[in-house]
């Protein structure tokens, strides 16, 4: 089953998100009812050649932020930076924007 790059999979059982917000073409975040910090999704280019039957959500990779400090919810400011080890995407969510490292 293919997944659209237009929007991350926000309806996983137990991980239903609200308030999905696009930071870049490849990075989104949203809110879980039971968590004070946002959940992030990244469309990982490193997974582009992986067969669909080996992927759970297309090239979308989730990142929880429970170990991060939520400085502000609106505009979003989260510390420290986020790093996706799958491909090395690294940066900060500050003032409601994504800032590359």
State where each predicted segment sits.
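A short Gly-Trp-Pro
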Residues: 1-41, 49-101
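Short, Lys/Arg-enriched phosphate-binding patches
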Residues: 45
């Amino acid at each position: 089953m293919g997944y659209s790059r237009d929007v991350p999979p926000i309806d996983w059982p137990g991980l239903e998100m609200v308030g999905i917000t696009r930071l870049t073409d490849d990075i989104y975040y949203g809110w879980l009812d039971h968590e004070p910090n946002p959940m992030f999704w990244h469309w990982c280019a490193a997974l582009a050649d992986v067969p669909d039957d080996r992927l759970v959500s297309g090239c979308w990779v989730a990142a929880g932020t429970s170990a991060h400090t939520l400085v502000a919810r609106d505009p979003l400011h989260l510390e420290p930076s986020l790093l996706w080890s799958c491909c090395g995407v690294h940066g900060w969510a500050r003032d409601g924007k994504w800032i590359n490292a």
